[in-house]
Amino acid sequence: MDNFQGDLTDVVRGIGSGHVSPSPGPPEGPSPSSMSPPPTSDLHVEFPSAATSASCLANPFGDPFVSMKDPLIHLPASYISGAGDNKSNKSFAIFPKIFEDDHIKSQCSVFPRIKISQSNNIHDASTCNSPAITVSSAAVAASPWGMINVNTTNSPRNCLLVDNNNNTSSCSQVQISSSPRNLGIKRRKSQAKKVVCIPAPAAMNSRSSGEVVPSDLWAWRKYGQKPIKGSPYPRGYYRCSSSKGCSARKQVERSRTDPNMLVITYTSEHNHPWPTQRNALAGSTRSSSSSSLNPSSKSSTAAATTSPSSRVFQNNSSKDEPNNSNLPSSSTHPPFDAAAIKEENVEERQEKMEFDYNDVENTYRPELLQEFQHQPEDFFADLDELEGDSLTMLLSHSSGGGNMENKTTIPDVFSDFFDDDESSRSL
């Protein structure tokens, strides 16, 4: 047909024959070797030329955009790795990998991207220079957060790859070993313990629960008691009272197999020298030998604890009774029983108190004022004493008893009174 006019089939055939060049030859598309760098614009899009539109023949409507793919995907790798220093080329080189990676959703992510990959080998620090990691680090450069790449390996240690977002795109490898948690807890220092088994001494009192601990020349103070499971006897806890900073401890309990044996467990060592006998007996737990001490030591302690007034009374009694044979002498007599010594001390105190009371009555005189000290003793000597009570005298006269003299004297007095009255009337 002339001028390509006719039905629709002729039009389509005319379009295909007019645009297809039958001459063979190399394609006119750009080759990788002779390709010039694209312009610096980020919105650069290359459209296919008329010679490369042979693929559009399958489209019956001749739409050139239907079969067109993304031109950025088919760019060579040399162009991506050889991007310039300017920011526009660098940002343009980021887009292909972002489109190719399915995990990255957007370029400017506010939160860090955590990528977990399983491998059998621990990645070296040299893997940070790979193009994928370089592109990923550059992709999150605009984000204030970094990208953490966690590699779970078969080894017992877990490695964390943290990308430092700097201009050189260098990454540093931080390894955090999953060590056991109990290593940070300090164990208690192993203390030396010494166990001693000795026969249990008999209790001094009648109570069966009384615990008697033998003396070991150290001063101990009981600070606790705990019942033992399966044993009727408790366990006592003691600490050293000789020195304030001593860490020595001991535990006293009866043996489960033989109740007549004491099991003493010493913990730690004393950091001070041996105490004296006085300091050893200063604690609450005294040995049984302390109850049978000689009376001289007890009398000396009793004298040291007496008040000053009792000392004065003792001096007075010693002056009045220098030869007192009832007092026991500490050098000649053997040790007495504690109860007998206590009774003697009580009797001596009572005697001293009675003596002091009598002495006070004899020697005490109240101090009078000076104006009364020079008065004679016969101050009331000039006064006469009444022979009888006047009231009794009047009662005796009214009752009719008594002396006749008194009866006669009383009417005479009244008679004189009445006589004087009659004489005055007559005048």
From Swiss-Prot:
Residues 311-333 have a biased composition (Polar residues). GO terms for molecular function: DNA-binding transcription factor activity; sequence-specific DNA binding. Residues 284-310 have a biased composition (Low complexity). Transmembrane segments: none annotated. Keywords: DNA-binding, Nucleus, Transcription, Transcription regulation. It is found in: Nucleus. Transcription factor. Interacts specifically with the W box (5'-(T)TGAC[CT]-3'), a frequently occurring elicitor-responsive cis-acting element. This is Probable WRKY transcription factor 35.
